[in-house]
Each structure stands twice: as structure tokens, then as C-alpha cells.
Amino acid sequence: MHEMKLDPLPFKMIGNGEKTVEMRLFDERRRKIKVGDMIRFENRESGEELLVRVMSCDVFPSFVELYRAYSKESIGYRSDEVASPADMEKYYSPEDIEKYGAFAIGIELIK
């Protein structure tokens, strides 16, 4: 079982089925994630938890390529929002993105 924390909005979007792809840095911790694994997401603010199953794992050189491969809704944007790979720099430094690359985790909500 893998465990990850999420901000409230992406947590809500996964919970209601809107967000089906979680984006992370492809670092040492994420390299252990495989199709069929379970991930427990914890809401950073409320402590609520969601359980998901990993349905797909895709690695990209950067978030630019990842964003091109998925619909903006599936990665957590609303249809009226502009999806920008630069948004990921809120979470990861450009140096780390270049070093590790981007990881798209296709997920299915269990509970």
C-alpha cells in the first residue's frame, strides 16, 4: 500500500471521479508503484482518506509531455481552466523535474 497526501481540491476531484490521473515526480519513491497496487490518499487539511487502485503507469521526460498525453479534466483541471505544465513547479523544482521526469498514475476509486 502506497500513501500520498493531496490538497483538498484534487482530493475532492478524485473522490467524485473527475480526476483519474495523479501526476507526480518519477522519483525513487514513485518508481515502486506498479499497476494493480493500492494508494491511500490523505486530504492534507481534513485527514480524510480515499483508496484507489493503480490502473496505469506512464513515465514522461517532463510534465510538458505528460500534459500533452491526457485531457486536462483527467489530470485535475476544470474545462474552463487553462492547463499549464508550469503549474507543477508549485510542487517540484525545475531541477528535480529535469532529473526525475514526470509520472502519470491512472487511478480507479475504490472507496
What are these regions, as identified by a protein language model?
Residues 48-59:
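Short beta-strand-centered aromatic/proline hotspots
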Residues 1-35:
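Compositionally biased, charged N-terminal/linker segments
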Residues 65-111:
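Contiguous surface segments at macromolecular interaction interfaces
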Residues 57-67:
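Short, solvent-exposed beta-strand-terminating loops
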